């Protein structure tokens, strides 16, 4: 039997014993001494069986736990061996270093040749590229903010009656209105820029 089966059996036996004990107490009050003696002996038999099952379960549990402990110790020893071998292999040979130095790096418009040489980088070209990228980013943010505002106005048009009902609520304040507007506006973030444009244009 597995450990789970033994535990399940012992739990059901405990429940049965509790039920039987309660019944024997109820019955012993109303029945004769001879019948209560026979019931008590059956309860004692069940207690003995229960103790035997519990003892067997604890033996199985001890064996299982000791197996697990041994497995953990073996795993820890294997990890220590791996760490030691990594430390030994972390020193690169001179041949490996030479091969790595000969590997050519990718070229770009900014470097103009293989590898990165700070003296060869055209800083003006890099500056222009960065400025262009930041301008595009600003335009996209402006577009997105404008689209979010249009999305918010579309929501207020569609759900204006519901918004008016919210305003009439006793706990509605000016802070609540601002928070609600910001939440609805930020709801546009769940769409990418093109989808948001499509939604706003289709209104």
Swiss-Prot record:
Residues 27-43 have a biased composition (Low complexity). It is found in: Nucleus, Nucleolus. It comes from the Eukaryota. One of its GO terms (cellular component) is preribosome, large subunit precursor. Residues 1-90 are annotated as: Disordered. Keywords: Nucleus, Ribonucleoprotein, Ribosome biogenesis. Coiled coil: none annotated. The keyword Transferase does not apply. InterPro entries: Ribosome_Assembly_3, Rsa3_C. Residues 59-78 have a biased composition (Acidic residues). Residues 46-58, 79-89 have a biased composition (Basic and acidic residues). Pfam families: Rsa3. Residues 12-23 have a biased composition (Basic residues). GO terms for biological process: ribosomal large subunit assembly. Associates with nucleolar pre-ribosomal particles. Belongs to the RSA3 family. Required for efficient biogenesis of the 60S ribosomal subunit. This is Ribosome assembly protein 3. The gene is RSA3.
């Amino acid at each position: 039997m597995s450990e789970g089966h033994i535990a399940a059996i012992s739990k059901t036996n405990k429940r049965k014993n509790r039920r039987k004990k309660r019944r024997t107490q109820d019955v012993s009050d109303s029945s004769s001494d001879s019948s209560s003696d026979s019931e008590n002996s059956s309860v004692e038999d069940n207690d003995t069986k229960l103790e035997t099952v519990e003892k067997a379960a604890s033996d199985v549990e001890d064996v299982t736990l000791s197996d697990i402990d041994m497995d953990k110790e073996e795993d820890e020893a294997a990890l220590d061996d791996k760490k030691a071998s990594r430390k030994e292999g972390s020193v690169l040979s001179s041949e490996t270093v030479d091969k790595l130095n000969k590997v050519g790096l990718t070229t770009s418009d900014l470097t103009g040749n293989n590898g990165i040489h700070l003296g060869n980088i055209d800083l003006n070209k890099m500056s222009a590229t960065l400025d262009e990228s930041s301008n595009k980013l600003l335009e996209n943010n402006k577009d997105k903010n404008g689209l979010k505002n249009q999305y918010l106005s579309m929501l207020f048009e569609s759900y204006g009656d519901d918004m008016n009902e919210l305003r009439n609520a006793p706990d509605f304040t000016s802070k609540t209105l601002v928070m609600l507007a910001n939440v609805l506006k930020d709801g546009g973030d769940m769409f990418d820029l093109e989808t948001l444009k499509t939604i706003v244009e289709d209104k």
